[in-house]
Amino acid sequence: MSGVLGIRDLGLQPYEPVLEAMRRFTEQRGPESQDEVWLVEHPPVFTQGQAGKAEHLLIPGEIPVVQTDRGGQVTYHGPGQLVAYLLLDVRRLSIGVRELVSRIEQTLIDLLASYGVQAVAKPDAPGVYVDGAKIASLGLRIRNGRSFHGLALNVDMDLAPFRRINPCGYAGLAMTQLRDLAGPIELDEVRTRLRGQLVRHLDYAEQTTLTGGID
């Protein structure tokens, strides 16, 4: 079992400053640095992963597009979507990347099950799905044995912008969200449940809430 997982609740934050802060944290951390999870919502933004292709951006319109260094293709972030950035020393956890992805997916599956929603992972398409519709996306980057980027769970948001792209590079991929499957949902409650599931599935002894900025 690992040590203490530090968790920061950042609220609503623009995407690019958080991206830069993740990169700095990953580059500057040492062998004893505490692993952290940053929980955040973003204003509307499309992000292109390293495998992203321009043809999957159909009609972005007024929503900005940001090129990132995570895995995967294009996705959408917006208010009402819970994003968790996983800043983990994967070597210290002694797990491979595939195992990390599987644990994150199971974290989401168990979280959704706590709301009575049956979700599954797909071996050929990272993320979590309910009856074929995607409810959570996953994209990581590993640098020097440390992960950054993470997961995005659709909780209670406007799904319309997903129709402006081919989500994750799949034309016509249906998207869904927790509100439509389980009724009215408090994002704070989902955030709390996600914290507990991450600690359990990533095998940390406990969690602690971190305060202060990420500059």
Swiss-Prot record:
One of its GO terms (cellular component) is cytoplasm. Residues 31-206 form the BPL/LPL catalytic domain. PROSITE patterns: BPL_LPL_CATALYTIC (PS51733), LIPB (PS01313). It holds the Pfam family LplA-B_cat. It is found in: Cytoplasm. It is an enzyme of class 2 (transferase). This is Octanoyltransferase. It comes from Pseudomonas entomophila (strain L48).
